[in-house]
Swiss-Prot record:
PANTHER family per record: GLUTAMYL-TRNA REDUCTASE 1, CHLOROPLASTIC (PTHR43120:SF1)
Gene3D superfamilies: Glutamyl-tRNA reductase, N-terminal domain (3.30.460.30), NAD(P)-binding Rossmann-like Domain (3.40.50.720)
Protein name: Glutamyl-tRNA reductase
Lineage: Bacteria, Bacillati, Cyanobacteriota, Cyanophyceae, Synechococcales
Gene that encodes the chain: hemA
Source species of the chain: Prochlorococcus marinus (strain NATL1A)
Amino-acid positions noted as binding substrate in the UniProt annotation, renumbered to this chain: 49-52, 109, 114-116, 120
Sites where the protein binds NADP(+): 198-203
Length: 441
């Protein structure tokens, strides 16, 4: 068995490729079912965010398992192999373990230390559990990754002052406004006519950061008015005009700055729409949706300044050097957590031998107990029989305690293998046969 991860992220693929592998809610169950049908996969879960799609799995054979997952990604995305493959990465065993720990800690994020990824890793664990696709190995790994993410944020300064995708989007708007006025600095958004399209979690974060940057009024559009009004109620200090998304054209004509963050699978704004509306001389569009809410052809329209999640790098790079230094604090903790998991993983190699040894001694115990009880005759009471049986079980457990503890203790693979070989020879254990023996129903 091997732990493997296959996927792509903002580091390896542009948004136009990533959006092809964004898994909408309505396709999550089907995706899990298709992955579980793959013979090579023993356990699996999916991490899908705006910046990454990663399949974590326990596979029988690493090469065959990775190829099978790659085939799933090709079929799901509809992309040709020569287009998708250059953007995919895969890690096995130690590298896979280290990768998920780093992802959960925010070290692999566009914004170093951002907190939202931890919630997304928690969701990955929950999805795997809900779809009954996690076994003891991946469940232990992913649960420990969540704990590692929490530990990094509580024991280091990496999470202090970290920005999110939403805050970076607001900062990008401030930066572009400043550059338009000939200044390489962030400007307040007080005078901008702002609109936010979508009323989900990302939009909630957008509103938080817009409020902190001086925005005191905006238009909020959503597919359902109630959800927009519920979100609006959480921000009483902002004057929010809630509209249905049907009013998008009217909103675009009145706004100077529009943020989009919806779950739509196709663009809701394109060049044709922008050409056919009466709008302000300059309209800034910032799209943090994946798949993208704004078509790439919007950039070709005069008077339109359109940005997507990949453009956030301009903002992130302004303070990334300082955050890189903070990330060094987390590396030691991640190495420690990886070592703990791998020691546990290695200790599983002893389980078949321990089970075989326990079974062998249990057979001897039962055989010898039966001989002893038969000699006692009918005068031996049921209570006395229970006492003798408990005594025999206690002796076996005492005999097993020290060798089992030693075998499970942290040690090098070679040392553990040597110990297993000695025990198997001393007790004449046939571990391979016991593994292949069918279980009693």
């Amino acid at each position: 068995m091997h732990i493997a991860v296959v996927g792509l992220s903002h580091r390896t693929a542009p948004v136009e490729v990533r959006e092809k592998l964004s898994i909408p809610e309505e396709l999550v169950e089907r995706s899990f079912n298709n992955l579980k049908k793959i013979d090579q996969i023993l356990e699996v879960s999916i991490l899908s965010t705006c910046n990454r799609l990663e399949i974590y799995s326990l596979v029988k054979d690493p090469q065959l398992g990775i190829e099978a997952i790659k085939s799933f990604l090709l079929e799901f995305s509809g992309l040709e192999d020569e287009i998708l493959s250059p953007h995919l990465f895969n890690y096995v065993q130690e590298k896979a373990v280290s990768h998920v720990m780093r992802v959960s800690a925010g070290l692999d994020s566009l914004v170093l230390g951002e907190g939202q990824i931890l919630s997304q890793v928690k969701k990955m664990v929950r999805l795997g559990q809900d779809h009954h696709s996690l076994g003891p190995i991946l469940n232990r790994l992913l649960t420990q990754a969540v704990s590692t993410g929490k530990r990094v944020r509580s024991e280091t300064n990496l999470g202090t002052g970290a920005v999110s995708i939403s805050s970076a989007a607001v900062e990008l708007a401030q930066l572009k406004l400043g550059q338009a006025h000939g200044r390489d600095q962030l400007m307040t958004l007080e005078t901008e006519k702002v609109a936010v399209v979508g009323a989900g979690r990302m939009s909630r974060l957008l509103l938080q950061h817009l409020q902190s940057k001086g925005c005191c009024s905006l238009t909020l559009l959503n597919r359902t008015r109630k959800r927009a009004e519920d979100l609006s109620a959480a921000f009483p200090d902002i004057q929010i005009d809630c509209q249905l998304i049907d009013e998008l054209d009217s909103c675009l004509s009145l706004s100077t700055l529009v943020f989009t963050s919806t779950a739509a699978n196709e663009p809701i704004i394109d060049a044709e729409k922008l050409i056919n509306i009466d709008r302000k001389p300059l309209l800034r569009l910032i799209d943090i949706g994946v798949p993208r809410n704004i078509s790439s052809d919007a950039k070709s329209v005069s008077g339109i300044e359109s940005h997507d999640v990949d453009d956030l790098q301009e903002v992130v790079s302004r303070n990334q050097e300082a955050r890189q230094k903070l990330a060094l604090e987390a590396e030691g903790l991640i190495e420690e957590e990886c070592r703990v998991f791998l020691e546990w993983w290695d200790s599983l190699a002893a389980v078949p031998t321990i089970n075989c040894l326990r079974s062998s001694l249990e057979s001897i115990r039962k055989e010898e107990l039966q001989k002893a009880l038969s000699r006692m005759g009918p005068d031996f009471s049921a209570r006395e029989r229970k006492v003798v049986e408990a005594l025999s079980k206690g002796i076996i457990n005492k005999i097993l305690h020290t060798p089992v503890t030693k075998l499970r203790a942290p040690q090098s693979r070679n040392d553990r293998r040597d110990s297993l070989d000695v025990i198997e020879k001393l007790f004449n254990l046939d571990v391979s046969s016991s593994l292949n023996k069918p279980k009693n129903n």
